[in-house]
Amino acid sequence: MLTMRNLATVLLLVVGAGASAAAESPRFTGSPSCATSMCHGGAGELRHQTTIWQKQDIHSRTYNTLVNARSAQIAAALKIPDAATSSRCTTCHAPFHDVPKAAFLAEITKPAEGVSCESCHGPAEKWIRSHTRPDFSHRDRVLLGLRDLNHLYVRANSCVACHQTVEPALLAAGHPELLFELDGQAVSQPKHWREKGDWHGPKAWLVGQAVALREMSAQLAQEKTPGEKLTAPWAASLWLLQKLDGLDSALPALKSAANASQAHPAADTLARRAAELEWSHDLTRQALQRLAKTHTEFADAKIPRLQQARRAERLVLALDRLTAPLDKPALAKLEPDLKELFALAQSLPDFAPEKFAKSLESLTKKL
């Protein structure tokens, strides 16, 4: 479930950019075309992707969410006959349900398979036969329709539409709030891929946060009477990224973004430039120190407690990803404070800013 604004974005990602007509666009071949034993459905590290997706990856079971009791309650509150067939739900939980039949190479549409291969990698008609050929470069495959998930900006955009914003009506009906975190969520996934580049870590975290702020800004700018569930997370996200203004001369500052309309393009520029940035351990260290020093703000009783709580939930995830690259002895030294910070940030109604400030100050002294 997502905002109606992002529904079109998700469909574009699924069907393929520039798809003006199904006949001219690459078509879907279906996950079975990827799952033969000689391809991604076999055994061993090079051929076990389908097995991992089917048995370990929650994306293969996203459709199941639509047929449980909670979804039935949400659908009833929204006066939707069936969550399993409504595009307000299937766009993210069963993407192929909303794709026209003409976009398929054969009768393979299986909404119940959830988020499958081509949902992320793009329609495979034009590249499936050539993507293993040694004389075809990665660029060649991308030109044929393979989504360039090696690029962090592209990767973030492929995920954020279904992992960040939810329309207010859905939230009011009981849909949980979403918080997009590209690096942490990617690391927590059962890996069906091999990595050779800088695709995880602080750089991925920053790109993901900038893309998340862009999406929240776009949603907020469209709402005539946005409630706290939209404004508070947006303000916390903007606050977090503003702490990194000036981290590198190639990155734009967000200090002047006074509202959602201004933050939207600024956040997108930040995401694009961060994805191209040559990241370093020094940048990680600087970002970590800047965010840790916000303990003085959490000690400020003039800042509303709920505002502090929203900041804290974003901050602890940032600290988690920025400390992940540290060596084991350094990370072990910080672990008690990190655990306490996470525990303190868990409950919005009971958030205690003064305790959070003390724990954050303790962590700051150990950096």
Question: What residue spans do the PLM features occupy?
Answer:
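Positively charged n-region of N-terminal signal peptides that target proteins for export
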Residues: M1-L7
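Long, charged low-complexity terminal regions
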Residues: P304-D337
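Charge-dense, extended regions
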Residues: K328-L367
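Short cysteine-rich clusters marking metal-coordination/redox-active sites
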Residues: C34-T36, C89, C117, C159
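Bacterial N-terminal signal peptides
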Residues: A8-G18
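Local sequence-structure signature of Cys/Sec-based thiol-disulfide redox active-site neighborhoods
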Residues: E24-M38
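Long, well-ordered hydrophobic secondary-structure segments characteristic of membrane-embedded
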Residues: A69-K101
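Primarily the internal scaffold of c-type cytochrome electron-transfer domains
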Residues: A43-A77, K101-V115, P123-E313, P349, ...
